[in-house]
A protein has these predicted regions:
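Bacterial N-terminal signal peptides
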Residues: 17-30
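Short, Lys/Arg-enriched N-terminal segments with co-localized hydrophobic residues
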Residues: 1-9
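Surface loops at the rim/top face of extracytoplasmic beta-rich domains
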Residues: 71-76, 100, 113-268
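Short coil-to-beta transitions that initiate beta-strands within beta-rich domains
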Residues: 54-58, 99-104, 217-220
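Blade-loop segments of beta-propeller domains
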Residues: 87-109
Length: 268
């Protein structure tokens, strides 16, 4: 039988919220339980190393096989930090809109990056009302803009803010996971609670149109398998059939608010 799809976990922010809840719970329990929690959260177990300063809204980073750190800024800049250096070099820049939390918001290196130089970027073009997920090639340490292969694009509303999420990660079998936000205003009449507003003029405040919609790419974790030609396949294990008869076949998980960051368990 085919292998089960990997288990995906939410961002560090989510994990920190869980840890905070456990801490509060520990206050209501025995002293031993509190001490046990304190031991598992001992910050002295971690070593902090400062790599660089002066970045403007860095979004994601990835470490290449040779130790080079690749990172993106929301303004559209891709930077490269060589091993032993504290000065990141500009490796390329995409034209993006940065309104309403848009911009260059996701990045992942291809599992065979050392051989093919492929890098995947999730960004918000200024001339398209939505998001692009594209593959580019790094040539001599620089982003070759002419090498772009557009894998996936989807429209969003830009009348109101917010929630575009944006995070890319590869799984152990070459699957690319893509985090997308619900593209819904979190405030206003909903007062920070789940935005469900079916009044026609309140569409930007209604997440039913996105996170709960099987025909929308927004408010989801998508899962595809990129092909060398620049397209992608649908791996087994997604929510809906590959023929699109019941929903977008790229959807792996739905009902997400704003999955800002994620990790993929490479063992499972």
């Amino acid at each position: 039988p085919p292998a089960s799809p990997p288990v995906i976990s939410m961002s560090r922010l989510f994990l920190s919220q869980v840890a905070a809840c456990l801490a509060v719970f520990g206050l209501c329990c025995s002293d031993a339980a509190v001490l046990a929690y304190q031991e598992t959260a001992d910050p002295s177990r971690f070593e902090l190393t400062e790599l660089v300063r002066g970045l403007v809204q860095p979004m994601e980073l990835a470490v290449g096989p040779d130790g080079t750190v690749w990172l993106i800024e929301i303004s559209g800049k891709l930077r490269r930090l060589s091993p032993g250096s504290s000065v990141p070099e500009l490796a390329g820049e995409l034209k993006v809109t940065t309104e309403q939390e848009n911009g260059l918001i996701g990045m992942a290196l291809d599992p065979q990056f050392a051989k093919n130089g492929w890098i995947y970027l999730q960004y918000s073009p200024p001339d398209y009302p939505g998001q692009h997920i594209s593959r580019f090639t790094i040539v001599d340490g620089q982003l070759d803009l002419s090498s772009e292969k557009l894998l996936l694009k989807f429209e969003e509303q830009r009348k109101e803010c917010c929630h575009h999420a944006g995070s890319l990660h590869f799984g152990p079998r070459g699957e690319l996971f893509i985090a997308t936000g619900d593209n819904t205003h979190p405030h206003g009449d909903s007062q920070g609670y789940a935005p469900i507003d079916e009044r026609p003029e309140k569409a930007p405040w209604d997440a039913q149109k996105s996170a709960a919609n099987t025909s929308s790419y927004s408010g989801k974790i998508l899962r595809i398998r990129p092909t060398p030609e620049g397209g992608y396949e649908i791996p087994e294990g997604n929510l809906f059939p590959a023929d699109g008869s019941a929903g977008r076949p790229e959807i792996y998980a739905m009902g997400c608010r704003n999955p800002w960051r994620m990790t993929v368990d490479q063992k499972t």
